[in-house]
Structure formats: structure tokens, C-alpha cells
């Protein structure tokens, strides 16, 4: 009887002793902990957990081993190592864990047939609960803050007092752009618990401001033009040779020119009014050299020969009498002087019309001679 009892104990121990892997599976599985407990996959709060997959089954075993070897290792570091090791496993090594995960899934379905995966949502923290009651309502949603939204005008050089008075007792906050932009004034948010809101100016307002600035600029330019003393150009009659100065026509022209100057006729350099005003007198600039007198050889006569008759005749309606055969009164008439350039250096008495002669005698002869050859074939160079 004792031998039979020993043999029965041996048989029962052989049948009940599972393999190492199966023992680990059973040890880590909730069924092995308490198969009779129907709430084996529920938490204390009544939440039903999902069944473990193959990786969870394998990681539960390996995690216990690592925690036994190095209890001070952080849980996140253990999870990283387990993930790397699971990827390195072969498919044949994963098969037993896949089978155990399938068994747990079927057990889970049998015990909880009405289970549906519903992930727990994290409760949203109400931001208004932590804030005081006065700031609970956001300024965008509150109708009072919309009506209390203040317009932020651009700062002008003379608008600092207006901006300070508009903000009331609250201090105004001036913000200047870092990139050279415009300045804006923001009211203090503490004033009467109204939220300051920046409303940018419309394009129409900006255009009106630009038009006002242009008008001010034009008024300023007109004032400067009026304040500036108008330049008066004194036109003096240049005396010509003795033969021409004794003529009556020349003296009459000189007298009329001086009368125009006395009457206050002025030349305006206003580019805007040149085309608009038709009453501006036309300027007649006549450069008429005095012909060389035949019998005069004194230095004063040479000086008179170099003088040019510069007359500015200003007429409002009737053109003046043509001077020295001038065909058109409003055109510039120029007549060349037929004289030797050597006489320029003679008799200089310090007048601003005397110019020194830098020409050599050879160059003077070339200028006095014929400039063009009779035959154009002489101008062709042959190489």
C-alpha cells in the first residue's frame, strides 16, 4: 500500500509538473493566479483590461528577470531594452508566446462577452475652473469685450496728448515695431475690466491720412516760395563799338530794356507754372558781336570787339523790333566773329569777358584757314 501510494504521488507530480515555458506562462497569466475568479481581468475600479498580446506576455517574464538582476534600473529603460530584444527575436522564438496570447484572448472573450475596447479618455482640465471668476470668460466670447474693443490709432508727432487722454486714468502702453514700423497705443487691460483689442486702420483711413500729408506738404512748399525773395536779374547794356553806340536805334533799344527792368519784370524759375501761365514774358537772348572797326588799333577797341551784346528783352504782348537783322524775336540769334584769335590776348583790362588765348600760332592759322578741302578725295586715307 505504501509503494502504491508512492507511485501515485510520482505520477501526479509528473503530470502536474509543467514545462519551464508553460510554467512561466501559467505563472504570469491571470488564470494561473485565480482561475475561479470571474474578475481576473478587472481593476479595482471595475475597468476591464484588454487581454495581453504576445509581446506583453514575453515582456512580463523578461521584466521580472531584469528587475531581479538590477532592481535600481528605471522602468522606462527596461521597456526600451525589452522592445529592442523583442525585435531581435526570430519568428520561431515568438511562436509559444503567440499561442499563450491567443489562449488568453479566448478566455477573455468567454469571461467578458459584452466587452468592447473603449480607450479611456483623459479628463480635460477646465481652464476656467482655475482662473478667478472675473477672468473666467474669454475676451473673444464675451459681448462686453467686443463692444469695449478700442481702436488703436497710429501715433503722430502731435498726437501724444490725445492718446494719453483717450486712455483715461489707465496708463497707455506704447509699442514700437522693431523694423521701423508705426507706433500703436494699447489701453491698459485693468481699466474697468475691459480687454484691450487692437483694430488696425482701414485702407481708406490710411489713404485719407496720406492725402492730408500731401496737402500739408504742398501748403508748406507754397509758403516757402512766397517767403523766398524773388531774384531780380539786372540786365545791363553792354557797350558796343563806337560806331554802333552812336546810332539812334541802339540807344533806343537800350532805353527800352532799362525801362523793362525798372518796371519790375522778373524771371521766375517755377517749373510748374511755365506751361500754365501764358503771360510770362519771353526771353530774347541776342548775342551780337560788334564788327571790327577798320581804322581803330587801340587796346580799348580790341576790348570792345571781344564784348558780346547780351540783352534780355522781356515782352508781354508785342515782340520787340528785330535787332541786327534778327529774323525771329523769340529765337536765339548767334553770329560768328570773323576775326583773328590772336587779338584776344591784347588789351585785357580785367574784364570778365576777356579770356586768355591758349592757342599756338600754328593752331590759329589752321583755324583761320579753310576747314574743308575742295576735293573729298583728299580726305580719304590710303594705306
Swiss-Prot record:
Gene Ontology annotations of biological process type: cell differentiation; head development; nervous system development
Classification via InterPro entries: HMG_box_dom, HMG_box_dom_sf, SOX-12/11/4, SRY-related_HMG-box_TF-like
Subcellular location: Nucleus
Biased composition (Low complexity): 158-169
Ranges of biased composition (kind: Polar residues): 1-11
Coiled coil: none
CDD domains on file: HMG-box_SoxC_SOX11
Main location: nucleus
DNA-binding region: 48-116
Keywords: Activator, Developmental protein, Differentiation, DNA-binding, Neurogenesis, Nucleus, Transcription, Transcription regulation
PROSITE patterns: HMG_BOX_2
One Pfam assignment: HMG_box
Molecular function per GO: DNA binding; DNA-binding transcription factor activity, RNA polymerase II-specific; sequence-specific DNA binding
GO cellular component: nucleus
Subunit field text: Interacts with nlk.
Task performed by this protein: Transcription factor that binds to the DNA sequence 5'-AACAAT-3'. Acts as a transcriptional activator. Plays a role together with nlk in neural induction during early embryogenesis.
Listed name of the protein: Transcription factor Sox-11
Name of the gene this protein is made from: sox11
